[in-house]
Amino acid sequence: MNNNIINLVAAIILSLSIIFGWQYFVVKPEQKKQQQQIAVQKAENLKKQQLKALVEPATGIVVQEESQIQRIKIESESLTGSISLKGLRFDDLILKKYKQDLSKNSPEVRLFSPSNTENAYFAEIGLVSNLSSVKLPNNDTIWNSDSEILSPEKPVHLFWVNEDGVKFLVTITVDENYLFTIEQTIVNYSDKELPVQSYGLINRKYIAVEKAVNILHQGPIGCIDENLKEYSYDDIKDKKSEKFAASKVDWIGITDKYWLSSLIPDKSSNYSSNFNYALKQGTERYQVDFISPVQIIKPGENFSIKSRIFAGAKKVDLLDKYEKQYDIKLFDRAIDFGWFYIITKPVFYAMNFFYGYVGNFGVSILIVTVIIKLLMFTLANKSYRSMKKMKNLQPEIDRIKNLYSDDKARLNQEIMALYKKEKVNPVAGCLPILVQIPVFFSIYKVLYVTIEMRQTPFYGWIKDLSAPDPTTIFNLFGLLPFSPPSFLMIGAWPILMAITMFLQQKMSPEPADPMQAQVMKFMPLIFLFMFSSFPVGLLIYWSWNNILSIIQQYYINKFN
């Protein structure tokens, strides 16, 4: 039985080593390579733009041909940009509250860009018909507008009339965050029946994304028939298309680590939806779209349908709010909380709750760690006692092993009888470790995928809890004027984590098995290198958790 425990602990350590080793030695170098490629690509694109002098002053990237098209300016607390009156396309959107990086002059994050720009990314809501004779607004239609500015206080009303006298009306509203509501109305003044279908699409030119194997999802996503559908860019590229016929579509879209663009169709009917890939003129494009059933509008009648577009930051409370307000199933799952969703989201709520009082997510992590420790104190106490008893029983266990070395069945019976007699649970020593594994991964997920943690400072030199510790001992934490390679970026917090881990081991009962004891001695050093590239918020949690464990073990040693 003792061997089983050792094997269990070894398996846990090995699993963690493989997961984090993959992250450190495979994913991180790949990320760096891709980031370099992206930087080179951006530099080349900028050079081309400068040579052609096609930059539009208003948005900084819209080419000159686009600047001739009339636009409706978007202005809210969270967004700026414009909507093209040609084709009524949402293709110019900037997130005002978020910078691309921490540098002083960093530009704001751009989400949508016109179709003929380098990072084309846009959304449309419109109408189609199964009859070619029906004249509907299309991508070349120039809409008439009653206003030049769209804001939360001022909706925009647009209209267009075809040659048969059919009037098309569109009302666009935007809230103070990232949600657009588009209501389309068709008034059939003609003498013919009008078959129409409402559609929505999001189209994106493929750009290299941050690799995060088994860490988070990036790419097409949606809730169809109340099931979450996630497809990577590679999945859709291989399949070319993933179709869903006559389904309940709550939402579909394209997600990045922190940003989401999503279509939210009217709930009045089912929709056909598609996740598509296309290669046109050497350019890779991905598209998600939906289309409604045919609606027949008789002469003299009118028809209205309402759809929504979400385009912005994946804030937890905001997605929760929209999910409840508009009954959008699984909208919060656009944030990839991972396998431990039922733990990860409550952990975030706890951190966010204390952040509301202390104003610092780093301090919030410390408070949540204390609460978790208090909840697990009784279990840790029992675990410590069990480990102590197991060590005291080791000589007797060795005697039984020697006595019944040729009879494994009898050997196990005798060892189990000894455990029962001494009232020892051999698994109890592992329980705190097993319980903390999902908590650890949950905190890691919260730090890695939630926008609330992005560029969030702690104290001192820590300006971003979601990024690695920027210091390193190999240049004396910045005193020496050179930057070591990435694998030598071992900062103050990783070192503190390793030191506290070593001290905790010294205060814990040493494993009875000599080999296991030797392995455990090297774990602080292994974890020092392994976790140096992880979010510093995770290292703050682990270091603080180790310090609390040391205090806890001191208390148990003194009073037991």
Curated annotation (Swiss-Prot):
It is found in: Cell inner membrane. Keywords: Cell inner membrane, Cell membrane, Chaperone, Membrane, Protein transport, Transmembrane, Transmembrane helix, Transport. GO terms for molecular function: membrane insertase activity. Interacts with the Sec translocase complex via SecD. Specifically interacts with transmembrane segments of nascent integral membrane proteins during membrane integration. It is a multi-pass membrane protein. InterPro entries: Membr_insert_YidC, Membr_insert_YidC_N, YidC/ALB3/OXA1/COX18, YidC/Oxa/ALB_C, YidC_ALB_C, YidC_periplasmic_sf. GO terms for cellular component: plasma membrane. Belongs to the OXA1/ALB3/YidC family. Type 1 subfamily. One of its GO terms (biological process) is protein transport. It comes from the Bacteria. This is Membrane protein insertase YidC. The chain crosses the membrane at residues 5-25, 334-354, 357-377, 431-451, 476-496, 522-542.
